[in-house]
From Swiss-Prot:
Fe cation binds at residues 254, 305, 372, 563. Keywords: Chloroplast, Dioxygenase, Iron, Metal-binding, Oxidoreductase, Plastid, Transit peptide. Disruption phenotype: Increased shoot branching. The phenotype of lbo max4 double-mutant plants is similar to the single mutant max4. Coiled coil: none annotated. It catalyses: 9-cis-10'-apo-beta-carotenal + 2 O2 = (2E,4E,6E)-7-hydroxy-4-methylhepta-2,4,6-trienal + (11R)-carlactone; all-trans-10'-apo-beta-carotenal + O2 = (2E,4E,6E)-4-methylocta-2,4,6-trienedial + 13-apo-beta-carotenone. Residues 1-56 form a transit peptide. Belongs to the carotenoid oxygenase family. This is Carotenoid cleavage dioxygenase 8, chloroplastic. The branching phenotypes of the max1, ccd7/max3 and ccd8/max4 mutants can be rescued by exogenous treatment with the synthetic strigolactone analogs GR24 and 4BD. The ccd8/max4 mutant also responds to carlactone (CL) and methyl carlactonoate (MeCLA), but not the lbo ccd8/max4 double mutant. Induction: Up-regulated by auxin in the root and hypocotyl. It comes from Arabidopsis thaliana. It comes from the Eukaryota.
Length: 570
């Protein structure tokens, strides 16, 4: 069945900003007639200068705030605001709502992601390099109070203090490492790398609410676990793990959190494998439930950005896209950055019992590349109540590693409108628990129905680890160089509904279930959208019909963000 494309005329661009506080991004910026940057001003910076070029400002709530003017740059194509840095460290204010917000929607949506891609005279290479920027949408009685703030990680504070890069980011290495000619410096850098000293704590990937109410920003380095105040967005400090596992450098960027516990994976670069760990709500101590040894024989474990759980099992991916110590130590990145592609070594999926830590299945599967698992559940084919097969769904990029290099900022900024986005699908793993050597990887829904793009997914959290029906994710309306649509995928009926507006780049669609709902898709979907004209807005879609029910425009453009969480009002 063909996708349903919901394309609506753009609503009015007028809005009201109230109780606004603004702080400029750099402490050495001046005000008045002086420039806030000595670099040539691109159009979005000109807007920032007009609106945000003051240390403190209060804007009359009765007067509409001007939007970015349509920018005209002679001789060059304007860069989409999704790939531009925020122009101030923090902002807060009320947004004017167009449409009607459900009365039951009371709480806070937080979104994390890279929001600053330059420091001093250095421009970062990759989407994943940017310094963490939190965005808040507080829903209260049909009103939306919004804010954003840069996370005060050690990496960001050091960069701001010294006006240069000081820690290794995803594709970036400090100049001090690159230019050091001392023959013994390489040994020192290995020590700093494996001790975690030189790795970033720039927690720019996800944000989670722990079972005890604490809110934590995360990235793939363990030191990049940072607590924040979800009301003020202020940084509280490092999450101090009370265990001996912190000597390992990296972790999954996407732990799985419930009201009672948190599960995560810790890759082992020395003895390639994965530790499966669990932490109870209210505790800072992680317990090792079990360990999986990599089957490939490679020098590094497969990249594990995310994983999945069922009611009784943990699903551990072992991709042929593997961590490479050689590439980790490089001063200049390769097209695969800190990884290498080893399809000749095989691809695997492991299944571990949550209760015993026993590996109950370890199967070889076709090669795959995935950032994000969607969900997993157990199937009982014999009808005796005992699981015989694990179904695990993910956003799978057709074993095409080009997606990593397509996220270079110069590519994103220069290829807008060109159909260069690599294909992706919902990949469905079937993992037998009968001792079989092989599992299956299938396409769950025809990829053309969601534009052959599929990532940044969410589900109804009440169906975590259970059989489910609906996936909310970023799809595409081609031609495009990045997912530019929101998709609701019915994996049972194999149907897709898409939301798309020309020139828009939406971030992860986050599903919030209606309290007391009896249908899986009874709720709302929240996304923050970056506009081609330099603006941005929050959009709410009905979880069932996937029709727009409300939007609220920011008074400035927000860059693209990654992952979010929902914090219900007490």
């Amino acid at each position: 069945m063909a996708s349903l494309i919901t394309t609506k005329a753009m609503m009015s661009h007028h809005h009201v900003l109230s109780s606004t506080r603004i702080t400029t991004l750099y402490s050495d910026n001046s005000i008045g007639d002086q420039q806030i940057k000595t670099k040539p001003q691109v159009p979005h910076r000109l807007f920032a200068r007009r609106i945000f070029g003051v240390t403190r400002a209060v804007i009359n709530s009765a007067a509409p705030s001007p939007l970015p003017e349509k920018e005209k740059v002679e001789g060059e194509r304007r860069c989409h605001v999704a790939w531009t840095s925020v122009q101030q460290e923090n902002w807060e204010g009320e947004l004017t709502v167009q449409g009607k917000i459900p009365t039951w929607l009371n709480g806070t949506y937080l979104r994390n992601g890279p929001g600053l891609w330059n420091i001093g005279d250095h421009d970062f290479r990759h989407l994943f390099d940017g310094y963490s920027t939190l965005v808040k949408l507080q829903f209260d009685g049909g009103r939306i109070f919004a804010a954003h703030r840069l996370l005060e990680s050690d990496a960001y504070k050091a960069a701001k203090k010294h006006n240069r890069l000081c820690y290794r980011e995803f594709s970036e290495t400090p100049k001090s490492v690159i230019i050091n000619k001392n023959p013994f410096s390489g040994i020192g850098e290995i020590v700093r790398l494996f001790s975690g000293e030189s790795l970033t704590d720039n927690a720019n990937t996800g944000v989670i609410k722990l079972g005890d109410g604490r809110v934590m920003c995360l990235t793939e380095t363990q030191k990049g676990s940072i607590l924040v105040d979800h009301e003020t967005l202020e940084t509280i400090g490092k999450f101090e793990y009370d265990d001996v596992l912190s000597d390992h450098m990296i972790q999954s960027a996407h732990p799985i959190v419930t009201e009672t516990e948190m599960w995560t994976l810790i890759p082992d670069l020395v003895k390639p494998g994965y530790r499966v760990v669990r932490m109870e709500a209210g505790s800072n101590k992680r317990e090792v439930v079990g360990r999986v040894r990599c089957r490939s024989g490679s020098w590094g474990p497969g990249w594990v950005h995310s994983f999945a759980v069922t009611e009784n099992y943990v699903v551990i991916p072992e991709m042929p896209l593997r961590y490479s110590v050689k590439n980790l130590l490089r001063a200049e990145p390769t097209p695969l950055y800190k990884f290498e592609w080893c399809p000749q070594d095989g691809a695997f999926i492991h299944v571990m019992s949550k209760l015993t830590g026993e590996v109950v299945a370890s199967v070889e599967v076709p090669a795959y590349v995935t950032f994000h698992f969607i969900n997993a559940y157990e199937e009982d084919k014999n009808g005796d109540g005992k699981a015989t097969v694990i179904i695990a769904d993910c956003c799978e990029h057709n074993a095409d590693t080009r997606i990593l290099d397509m996220l270079r900022l110069d590519t994103l900024r220069s290829s807008h409108g060109h159909d260069v986005l690599p294909d992706a699908r919902i990949g469905r793993f079937r993992i037998p628990l009968d001792g079989s050597k092989y599992g299956k990887l299938e396409t769950a829904v025809e990829a053309e129905k969601h534009g052959r793009a599929m990532d940044m997914c969410s589900i109804n959290p009440l169906y975590l680890g259970q059989k489910y029906r609906y996936v909310y994710a970023c799809g595409a309306q081609r031609p495009c160089n990045f997912p530019n649509a929101l998709s609701k995928v019915d994996i049972v009926e194999k149907k897709v509904k898409n939301w798309h507006e020309h020139g828009m780049i939406p971030s992860e669609p986050f599903f919030v279930p209606r309290p007391g709902a009896t249908h899986e898709d009874d709720g709302v979907v929240i996304s923050i959208v970056s506009e081609e004209n330099g603006g941005s807005f929050a959009i709410l879609l009905d979880g069932s019909s996937f029709e727009e029910i409300a939007r609220a425009k920011f008074p400035y453009g927000l860059p693209y963000g990654l992952h979010g969480c929902w914090i219900p009002k007490d």
